[in-house]
Curated annotation (Swiss-Prot):
This is Beta-ketoacyl-[acyl-carrier-protein] synthase III. GO terms for cellular component: cytoplasm. It comes from Streptococcus agalactiae serotype V (strain ATCC BAA-611 / 2603 V/R). Pathway: Lipid metabolism; fatty acid biosynthesis. Keywords: Acyltransferase, Cytoplasm, Fatty acid biosynthesis, Fatty acid metabolism, Lipid biosynthesis, Lipid metabolism, Multifunctional enzyme, Transferase. Residues 249-253 are annotated as: ACP-binding. The gene is fabH.
Amino acid sequence: MVFAKISQLAHYAPSQIIKNEDLSLIMDTSDDWISSRTGIKQRHISKNETTADLANKVAEQLIEKSGYSASQIDFIIVATMTPDSMMPSTAARVQAHIGASNAFAFDLSAACSGFVFALSTAEKLISSGSYQKGLVIGAETVSKVLDWTDRGTAVLFGDGAGGVLLEASKEKHFLAESLNTDGSRQGLQSSQVGLNSPFSDEVLDDKFLKMDGRAIFDFAIKEVSKSINHLIETSYLEKEDIDYLFLHQANRRILDKMSRKIDIARDKFPENMMDYGNTSAASIPILLSESYENGLLKLDGNQTILLSGFGGGLTWGSLIVKI
C-alpha cells in the first residue's frame, strides 16, 4: 500500500505589520480591548502582494527545502477564500510561477477549514498510488475583503500563507479524520461578493466579509470540541498519545475553552494569533511551519498531532497525523 507523509513545511507573511495601537487611530478600539478578547496583538497586511504572491513564496521554499525540481511535483492545491481572480486559480498561478510543468493545480474553498480539507484531499490523491508529490498551501489576503471601519471584523484578520510538501511513504502517517459542513448555518459568516447578472434587477454590491462572532465562538466550542473528542475516541488513541493540537488560530479564548472541553492540557495547544491574527486557511500551516522552526515539531515521524480547522460554511474538520 501507498501512504502519504508531510515532509516539508514553509510559511510567509507580508512585511507590513499593523499593531492594535495603529487600529485605534482609525476606529473605536484599543490594544487592551482587542488583546483581552482575542489574544491578537498585531497582524501582517499586504500592500501590493496578491494571494498568489504569498502562495508563490511558500511554494518556492518548499521546493528549495525538498531538493526536488518543480517538474517532479504532481499536483498543487491552494486553500483560499480570497483568490485574486475567478480564473485562473491561485494554484494555477503558483504552478506557472515555480515551473511545475507536470502538475495539475486547483483551488479549494472551505474558509478557515480550507487547509484541513485540502490536506485530506491531497492525502487521498497520493494514497491512490497515482501521484507521488504534491504541494498543499493555505494562502489568504483577507485584508482586501474587510470593512476597515468595522471593529468586529477588521481587528481580527491578517494576511499570510503556509504550506506543506506531501509525498508518498511506505508507512501510515494519516491516522484519522473527520470533515464536516452545515450549509444551513452559512449566514453566520459570509462575504456576499457576487456577480451582477445583466438579466436581473438585483444588485450585489456587499463586498465585505461579515461575521457573527458570538455565534462562531459558540459553534466552535460546542460542535468542534465534540467532533475532536469523537475523532480521538474512534481513532483508538488515548488523549495522552496526542503530542500537540494545532487548531485554527481565531481567538485565544477559543483555545482556552477547547482545552477544557477536550480535557487536554493547554500547553499542548500552540498559538501564534498574537503575531498574525486570524489568517483563515493559512493559520494552521503557518503555525506548523513556525513550530518546526522553533523546535516544537521534529518532522521525524515520531510525533502525533491533531489539526483542526473551523469557520464559515459552516465547515469544520480535523486530522490526526504522524509527523
